Amino acid sequence: MIINSQKRSFGKGAKVSLFTLGTMRATESLEKMYNIIKNAYYVGINHIETAPSYGDAESLIGKSLKKLAIEENISEKNWVITNKVLPKGDFEFLKNNFKKTTEIMVLHKEVIIKILNAKI
């Protein structure tokens, strides 16, 4: 059973839950990430937050969403994933992967200043 949580518009019409699932500390195993994301879905959370600095989180999220699509018939399109680059982030990663995999990118103020001053 899905608990209907409130959703709000975010960006260009995406509807996201009021609560976001942060994945910084959920990188122990695929099984743990899968269960956390599955439980989040069933309480109405559809917004996942991650960052390259979270270790294996991005990979585990991707594998978990694929597994949820197969085992629970929960489409990957149900999710809004927010990625971010921290002040000491990898700008090459940002440059090479932003267009491929990211819908929403959060940049800390220090990152914006570095980008404005750099030629990437």
Question: What kind of region is each of these model predictions?
Answer:
Residues 72-95, 116:
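Structural motif corresponding to the early beta-alpha repeats
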Residues 90-120:
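Glycine/proline-rich, positively charged
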Residues 24, 51-53, 84-88, 115-119:
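Active-site beta-loop-alpha junctions enriched in small/polar residues
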Residues 1-79:
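N-terminal binding-site loop/beta-alpha segment at the start of enzyme catalytic domains
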